[in-house]
C-alpha cells in the first residue's frame, strides 16, 4: 500500500546526518518487494532491479528539522518530508515495485535514497556521482504530478566574522556590527547590479541574509553573519567568492557549499517519455526551473545524461509547518512515473 508505506517513512525522523533508521527501513521494504537492496558506504538506501540500460532514480531521505505531526486529513498526508522529499522517493519505490511485479521492466533501475541533501555537503550525491554512469536520471523532488523540473540554480554560502577592540558607542569609528551590515549591503548591491535588466529569477543572483548576530565579552566586540546566494547558469561559485572577498570590510570570510547552476535539455527520450505519460494520465505537462538547489546540481555535470526532477507535491510547502502531500496526486504521480519508465526502457533498449 503506497499510502501506508509513505506514512511509515514519515513517522521515522531523519534530519540530515541522522538518516540511519529510515535507510534501514527502506532497505527492508525494498528487499521484501524483490529489490537487491543495501545501505551503501555513505549511508544511502539503495535498491536495484532489472537488467539493461541503467536508469538512476536519485531521491533523498533526509529532511530539515521541525516536527510536523503525521496525520491524514481531507485526503492529505501531513508530515515532515511528505513533500521534500520522502514523498517523491516513495513514488520511486512504488512505481518500480509495480513494474517489477507486472513484468514490465526493460531497464535496470537503481533507486538511491540519498543522505544529507538538505545539508551543504550533499554527501549522498557526491558518493554516487563516480559510481554510476546512467543512461538517464530522475531526481526525486516535488514538481507536481504534471510538471517536470529541468533545472536548479547554483548556490554559494558566505560566513563572515568581524572583531575589534571594544570602544565607546559615542566614538567616531564604525561599530563592528556596522561592518557586518556594510558587507551585507555591498553583497546585495553587487547582486542588484548584476540583475539589472534580467527579468527571470532563474537568471538572477538571489542573496538572502540567513543569520546575523553581534556581541561583546567586555574587551572585544564581534559580529557574525551568514549569507546564502542562489546563482544563475553563468556565475561560477569560485569566481563569485573571489569577487566578494574584496568587499570583506576587514572581516574573516569563509565560503562553502558552492555548486554551479544546472539546466537539463528537454529534447531527449526521458523528457518525451514523461510528456507522453502525463498526457496519458489526463494532464497537460509543463516545465519548471527552480530557484533552489538539488542533487541534480551535483550529478548532472558529471553524468551528462538526460535528467529531470519529478515528484508529487507543492514545493511552496517545503520546510513549512504545514507540509503535506495530496494523496490523489501522490498516487497519480506513481502512475505517471511507472508509465514514463516503461516507455523509456522500451526506447533505450
List each language-model region with its residue ranges.
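Short, structured coil segments at secondary-structure junctions
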Residues: 73, 132-133, 249, 303
Amino acid at each position: 500500500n503506497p499510502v501506508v508505506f509513505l506514512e511509515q517513512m514519515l513517522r521515522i525522523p531523519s534530519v540530515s546526518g541522522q538518516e540511519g533508521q529510515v535507510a534501514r527501513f527502506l532497505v527492508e521494504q525494498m528487499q521484501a518487494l524483490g529489490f537487491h537492496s543495501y545501505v551503501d558506504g555513505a549511508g544511502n538506501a539503495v535498491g536495484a532491479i532489472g537488467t539493461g540500460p541503467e536508469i538512476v532514480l536519485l531521491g533523498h531521505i533526509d529532511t530539515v528539522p521541525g516536527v510536523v505531526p503525521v496525520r491524514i486529513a481531507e485526503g492529505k498526508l501531513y508530515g515532515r518530508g511528505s513533500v521534500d522529499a520522502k514523498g517523491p522517493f516513495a513514488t520511486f519505490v512504488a512505481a518500480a515495485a509495480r513494474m517489477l511485479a507486472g513484468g514490465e521492466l526493460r531497464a535496470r533501475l537503481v533507486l538511491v535514497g540519498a543522505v544529507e541533501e538538505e545539508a551543504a555537503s550533499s554527501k549522498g550525491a557526491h558518493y554516487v556521482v563516480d559510481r554510476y554512469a546512467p543512461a538517464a536520471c530522475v531526481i526525486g523532488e516535488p514538481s507536481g504530478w504534471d510538471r517536470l523540473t529541468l533545472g536548479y540554480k547554483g548556490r554559494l554560502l558566505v560566513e563572515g566574522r568581524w572583531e575589534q577592540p571594544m570602544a565607546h558607542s559615542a566614538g567616531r569609528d564604525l561599530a563592528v556590527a556596522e561592518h557586518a551590515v556594510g558587507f551585507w549591503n555591498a553583497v546585495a548591491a553587487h547582486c542588484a547590479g548584476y540583475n539589472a535588466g534580467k527579468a527571470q529569477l532563474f537568471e538572477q543572483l538571489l542573496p538572502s541574509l540567513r543569520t546575523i548576530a553581534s556581541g561583546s565579552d567586555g574587551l572585544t566586540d564581534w559580529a557574525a553573519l551568514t549569507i546564502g546566494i542562489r546563482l544563475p547558469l553563468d556565475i561560477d561559485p569560485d569566481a563569485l567568492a573571489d569577487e566578494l572577498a574584496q568587499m570583506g570590510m576587514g572581516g574573516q570570510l569563509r565560503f562553502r557549499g558552492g555548486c554551479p547552476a544546472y539546466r537539463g535539455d528537454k529534447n531527449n527520450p526521458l523528457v518525451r517519455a514523461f510528456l507522453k505519460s502525463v498526457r496519458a494520465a489526463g494532464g497537460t505537462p509543463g516545465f519548471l526551473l527552480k530557484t533552489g538547489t538539488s542533487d541534480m546540481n551535483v550529478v548532472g555535470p558529471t553524468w551528462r545524461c538526460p535528467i529531470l526532477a519529478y515528484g508529487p507535491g507543492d514545493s511552496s510547502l517545503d520546510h513549512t509547518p504545514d507540509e503535506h502531500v495530496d494523496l490523489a496526486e501522490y498516487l497519480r504521480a506513481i502512475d505517471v512515473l511507472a508509465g514514463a519508465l516503461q516507455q523509456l526502457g522500451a526506447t533505450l533498449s
